[in-house]
Amino acid sequence: MLSFREVKKRVKIPGFHCHHIIPLEIIDKAAFRPLFRTMRELGFDFDDFHQNGMYLPCTEANAAAFRLPLHRGPHPVYNQLVCERIAAFDRQRRDSQLFEMQQLQSGLKAALRRNELPLRKGSRNPFTSDADFECMEIAAYRLWNLLPSH
């Protein structure tokens, strides 16, 4: 396992930040503690960069060059989307929760790589500065093949 702390210390990529696919803010929410405790018991480690992380550009130049969303800190709209998806997990079926979490992470990573889930803060994203929550909802529905891709 390579923790986020180790990645930040040993693998510095200029112009990029480490991004938690499932944000720490959500992991710390009291309502989700039982679910995340179950996830840990099933072997899911939210601090494992390979499982729960990816590099995203933190400069407009790199966002343009790599066509990825700009990451410059907190991203409350992204967090809200992830929170809503996790809240929809089937709490009665412990055996399906790990699968649902892995599917969510895979879908979020893929959508971020396609620049479909903008990480908005006060700074502007050169490709998705006009994106809003509706855009993120459409991308989320595509993750579960509920809408055709464009």
Residue ranges with predicted function:
Residues 1-68, 129, 133-149:
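Betabetaalpha-Me/HNH-type nuclease active-site subdomain
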Residues 60-150:
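C-terminal, well-folded lobe of enzymatic/effector domains
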